[in-house]
Amino acid sequence: HKSFSGGMYDSRQPMPDFVHTVAQQIGLTNTGYVFYKMDTLDIMPTHVDHFETYERVFGVERNNTYRALIFMEDWKPGHYFEVAGVGKTNWKAGEYALWHADVPHAASNIGSSSRYTLQITGELVDGKSI
């Protein structure tokens, strides 16, 4: 097995234009993007992201840093996501989760097909709350 956490395609690479539209619809600004592929048996145990590079590059303080995870395809058996101790399954393509930088989260894939998501890191636009 090549990896325990999955494969990433991040903002250092060309991004499709739609990622900016998605970020605006969610209410995020000063955004960084990562497409994430989680193969069968990839796991990401419960953790809190550090966001040091994002916060340095964009000049954003941690208390203003948020992460959105957009599900690129409908849920498939064996795909799992958890944020703040609450598990999520049965999602539809386009649904998303949004959480503050200090919130623990986890993911795993024990299914027979890859799981694809888009991670967007950013600040909430003025007046937006979760």
Language-model segment annotations:
Residues 66-71, 96-98, 112-129:
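A short hydrophobic beta-strand segment most commonly corresponding to one strand
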Residues 79-83, 108-113:
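Short conserved catalytic/interaction loops centered on acidic-Pro-aromatic/His motifs
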Residues 30-33, 41-43, 65-69, 76, ...:
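Extracellular structured ligand-interaction cores
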Residues 46-49, 72-73, 84, 99-102, ...:
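Short His-Asn-centered micro-motif
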Residues 1-44, 50-56:
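Signature of the catalytic double-stranded beta-helix
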Residues 65-92:
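A short beta-strand-loop-beta hairpin characteristic of the jelly-roll/cupin
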Residues 47, 52, 61, 104-106:
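Histidine-centered active-site/metal-ligand motif
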Residues 89-105:
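Conserved metal-binding segment of the jelly-roll/cupin
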